[in-house]
Amino acid sequence: SVSGNTVTVKSVGAGSANITVKSASNTNYNEKTVTYSVTVKYQTFTENSGVGYYADTDENGTVDGIIFADFKNGGSGYWGVSSDPYTIPTKTGLEEYYVSKTNYNGPFGTKDVLSARGSGNARFNVMALSDYNNGTKYYFKDAKNIKSGEWSMPTINTWITFAGQLNIRKTNQYREYGLKDTYWSSSGEYIGLYNGFTYSYSPYEKFPVRLSRTF
């Protein structure tokens, strides 16, 4: 857009570009063209905690998951009716992150999306936004080896951490987040989001799978 002597160009993403401005000629002015080189950088993420932000884990523009643990801070807590404990370790030498999309409206509300750049240790734990294979239910013997790239089945502690950090309770309409009642963990234990309990392995039950990863 043009306003007086100011030309405004909307950014379409990070990177370098040349902007060419061409003014039209008239009786008092000859046509002139000027080219400017610009570099657009994404905003570096500087908040103390990334919990509750969305994650684009492979920088392809698709939002992949919700961040539920931040290894920069670590932490601990309890979740559920039986107050199952969880612990988040602390790590150093972490990757740098930037805001790749602002105000993304997803199943966990409206929040910015983070992506990683550079090298270092993964700072966050991320849960996928949807169930594996469209929510298909599996016996554990069929579910235990499910993986997808760097995504794998969460441990029971990871599930407890996820539910505790995002305050997922049986009374807070967890289904609004796109979550099912019950999920397998990698050990065969399973978590009941609908009632706040965790359970030992059962060979007779069928549950969906949701994957997690560090990022």
Stretch-by-stretch model annotation:
Residues 8-9, 150-152:
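A glycine-rich, coil/turn loop motif that links secondary-structure elements
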Residues 10, 27-29, 117-118, 175, ...:
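Sterically constrained small-residue positions within well-ordered secondary structures
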Residues 1-43:
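Extracytoplasmic soluble-region selector
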Residues 42-150, 192-194, 198-215:
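Short, compositionally biased
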Residues 21-23, 29, 127, 139, ...:
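Mature, Sec-exported extracytoplasmic domains of Gram-positive
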Residues 2-4, 31-33, 120-122, 147, ...:
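Short, solvent-exposed coil/turn segments
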Residues 15, 130-132, 157-159:
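Histidine- and/or cysteine-centered catalytic micro-motif in compact active-site loops
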Residues 156-215:
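C-terminal, surface-exposed recognition/capping segments
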